[in-house]
């Protein structure tokens, strides 16, 4: 599938040089200026072809009115100074304020999307993904003149390569190739650190704390943590048949988690990202500390618990995973000393 933005108007200029009485240096400067102008014109009229989850997408450059529905992109784009004309503001991590203004149209959330607001923002590029992946066809229908990019990590593909694929494509689209390369280098360094720090035998349990409850995040499939079991070669303390990527974790009893007696527990505090300002919010650390069934678990008694950044649930960008991997590496390295 290929969708192309309307061709940009090419700016042409005619430069007349008065050769008589001009010095050689003036000729050189004029030639250089004309060359620069031509180069700029070509750049402004160029395009880039990106291979996304639906095929080849041609994006005209420079992008003037980008919109994004993919949570994995917000921190990256904000750090790069990329403005957006529309975003699902309820889903933008609270740690990111670049898209809070009235100049950014609010397109609701994945449960109650306001795609008409997206269309009214007249984007020339829409980045579709994560919670809005199912809205791809509707978005395509309502924004026929926009290029659509869907870079959601694909099932069956290596998760690290998928994160890198996304940030590489964003770098190409927004002229931030060097910045994208640096994010990838930082991510790969963190991944290697965590791999090298793991002793290869300690058992690991991953959980999601939501609403004061502790949910199980299984190897491979579990939300946030699942792919890291494969990337780092972690030994699961417990494997449950039919585990899912449920946003609150799978319903496995805390007693069953405790009986598996993990050496390490990886924790994602879902509520920290969405309800931390509410009076009944209880931090994940307090939930775990207050759960009687877990108090004799090795990970608890040895204080071998790693917490994901507070905004992980609404972020999950390559930057978030770099932070998570470095935290895991720090913890594993500390346990060896």
Language model feature labels by segment:
Residues 92-95, 218-248, 311:
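Alpha-helical, coiled-coil/dimerization segments enriched in small aliphatic residues
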Residues 122-128, 144, 257, 261-266:
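Proline-aspartate-enriched helix->loop->beta-strand connector
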Residues 198, 211-217, 234, 245-275:
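Ligand-binding pocket segment of bilobal, Venus flytrap-like solute-binding proteins
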Residues 56, 135, 144-212, 304, ...:
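Extracytoplasmic substrate-binding proteins
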Residues 263-337:
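Structured C-terminal subdomain patch of bacterial secreted/periplasmic proteins
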Residues 52-54, 107-114, 243-252:
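Short helix-initiation/N-cap motifs at beta->coil->alpha
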Residues 2-14, 18-71, 178-207, 268-281, ...:
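Bacterial Sec-exported substrate-binding components of ABC uptake systems
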Residues 64-65, 70-117, 121, 125:
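A short, structured surface patch at a secondary-structure boundary
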């Amino acid at each position: 599938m290929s969708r192309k933005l309307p061709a940009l108007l090419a700016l042409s200029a005619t430069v007349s040089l008065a050769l008589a009485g001009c010095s050689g240096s003036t000729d050189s400067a004029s030639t250089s200026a004309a060359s620069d102008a031509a180069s700029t014109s070509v750049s402004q009229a160029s395009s880039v072809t990106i291979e996304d989850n639906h095929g080849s997408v041609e994006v005209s450059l420079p992008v003037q009115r980008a919109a994004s529905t993919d949570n994995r992109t917000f921190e990256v784009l904000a750090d790069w100074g990329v403005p957006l004309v529309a975003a699902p503001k309820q889903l933008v991590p609270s740690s990111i304020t670049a898209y809070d203004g009235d100049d950014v149209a609010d397109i609701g959330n994945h449960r109650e999307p306001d795609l008409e607001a997206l269309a009214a923002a007249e984007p020339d590029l829409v980045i579709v993904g994560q919670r809005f992946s199912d809205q791809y066809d509707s978005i395509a229908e309502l924004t026929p003149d926009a290029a659509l990019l869907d870079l959601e990590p694909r099932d069956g593909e290596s998760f690290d390569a998928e994160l890198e694929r996304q940030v590489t494509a964003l770098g190409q689209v927004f002229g931030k190739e060097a910045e994208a390369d640096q994010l990838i280098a930082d991510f790969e360094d963190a991944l290697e650190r965590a791999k090298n720090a793991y002793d290869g035998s300690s058992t690991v349990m991953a959980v999601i704390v939501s609403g004061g409850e502790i949910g199980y995040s299984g190897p491979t499939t579990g939300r946030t943590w699942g792919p890291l079991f494969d990337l780092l070669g972690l030994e699961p303390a417990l494997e449950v048949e039919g585990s899912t990527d449920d946003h609150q974790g799978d319903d496995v009893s805390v007693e069953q988690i405790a009986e598996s007696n993990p050496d390490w527990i990886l924790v994602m505090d879902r509520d920290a990202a969405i309800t931390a300002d509410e009076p009944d919010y209880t931090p994940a650390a307090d939930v775990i500390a207050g759960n009687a069934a877990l108090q004799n678990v090795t990970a608890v008694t040895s204080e071998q618990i790693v917490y994901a950044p507070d905004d992980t649930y609404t972020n999950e960008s390559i930057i978030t995973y770099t932070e998570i991997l470095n935290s895991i590496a720090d913890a594993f390295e500390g346990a060896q000393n």
